[in-house]
Structures are given as C-alpha cells and as structure tokens.
Amino acid sequence: TELSEGMKVKFYLTLALSHHAKLLILDEPTSGLDPVSRDEMNEIFRKLADKGVAILFSTHITSDLEKCADTITYIKNGEILQSSKKEDFISHYTKEIGGAPSLEDIMVHIEREEVIL
C-alpha cells in the first residue's frame, strides 16, 4: 500500500528524530495535507520546538507560520529581504499597512510590493 502525504511526512520526521536530529530542515512539510493532518503536523512541530529541536521550514501557507513560527525570514529570488521575530515582523507591517492585518494580508502586500521591506 502507498502512504498518504501526511504519513510520508511523519515517517521521514520519525526517521530524522531516530538519529537525534537537533535541526530539521523541511521544504513545504504541510503542502498537500488535509486540514486535520496539517494541524497534527503543526502540533508535532510545536512539541519538538518545545523540546529544543530547531525547525527550519519553507512554506507558502501563512497559517503554518501563525501557528508555528518564532521567526519569519522572507526570501525573494534567493535574497533574504526581511528576518525577524514573528511578533516584530507583524508589528512592523501592521504600522505600515494600518488596521489589524492578518499575516496572510501582510504577505499579499509584500508580494504585490505595496510595502517596503
């Protein structure tokens, strides 16, 4: 039988942790997962971070950032344009955009180059 995307992610995560990895580098780890599986993975990431495992992951899913990120690094065309604590990142762009934008709203403004990085 073939593993679901969620089971594949969990399998590879378990494999890395079996070697006592202190750093996990994951490319779009929740992409293609259903909402329940995505929430389960984010919970696993939070628990691992609480235990001292550093997790670096790329994503286009802003809800993952809202749930898991301590730090957000914005990279465009291979160049780091912004890197800061999540709260500072949101605060900076909230001042620039005004109101109470969600992280997704902020990312849309950045992508449309409506704000200054």
Model-identified regions with their sequence ranges:
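ABC ATPase "signature
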Residues: 83-84
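A short, surface-exposed alpha-helical micro-motif characterized by mixed small hydrophobic
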Residues: 65-67
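Helix N-cap at the start of a conserved alpha-helix in ABC-type nucleotide-binding domains
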Residues: 35-37
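Hydrophobic anchor residue at the start of the ABC signature
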Residues: 13
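Conserved H-loop
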Residues: 53-61
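Catalytic Walker B motif of ABC-type/P-loop ATPase nucleotide-binding domains
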Residues: 24-28
